[in-house]
Amino acid sequence: MKIQVLVICLLLITIPLTATKYAGEIFAVSPGVLSTAMGSTGLTYVGSLSAGWWNPALLALNPESGIELMRCEHFEGLMAQNQLSLIIGSKTKTSLTFNHLAIDKIKLTKLENPDDSLSNENRPVVWKTISNQDFILYAGLARQLKKTLYLGISPKLAYRSLAENSGYAFGADLGMLWQINKQANLGVNLRDFFSTQVLWEGGENETVIPNLDLELSYDFSPIKNIPVHLAVRSEILLENREATVETGDLSADFHAGIAVQPISNLCLLAGYDIDCFTAGIGVSYKRLGLNYAFRNGSEDDLGYSQRISVSYQW
């Protein structure tokens, strides 16, 4: 009960009175392949080049520098996602992630005679084809606060072009990583912690409701030289959404994932993402990497998603 009250208070103090439900959906589309293959767990996984998005505090662990290019098709190709992730720096790491979301060939219709009612002689016809485009840029910075405690921040900017409307958005996420011991880690990400704004050119604006991500992971080797990463994650929102667990405006969904590395250049991944199963594989050769993830269709029949990426580390 005390934990529930603490979570509610933490979210409430960051929510403005004008917050808009679903305004932050574009920021919820994750980059990367490996974390997606693990059921969308990634707040404690440092092996991904998109780690700065999942939890910017991971950058304080000095991960390898590199670049990743990803292509994803959501809902059996209805929405495309293109992404570039970059981690640079020597002693101090910085991440940059560029995410592009697109829904193309959206057909707009109107009646042949707009002044008359719908009938067999006055049918809808396609008069225009449009597309929806989102361009989102994330940065990530981190520092070590104590021996086992790390803090990170991820500012973000976005440009939205939806049909004949366009707008801009800006905000930031706040991440934390606590190394409980040599094997267990706790990751926290307070997304949109200072009221991310979406400003439309027509004069309207939306405020993104903050949400809280919590993840607990455990790393071990059941067999010598075969590392295993286990993680469970919870998304906690105050938007009165339908979710796995609901109580008033508070809702929570859950994720779980596993990564097994039988040999140094092969990683096998699987997970559970709310109501879907995920799986994937990561293959590396010297500094080159190739990753693939699959997410099966949900109960809403929105179709499956596939991701593939190539990477280079130095």
Spans of model-derived segments:
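Positively charged n-region of N-terminal signal peptides that target proteins for export
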Residues: 1-5, 147
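Subset of outer-membrane beta-barrel
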Residues: 19-314
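Sec-dependent N-terminal signal peptides
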Residues: 4-14
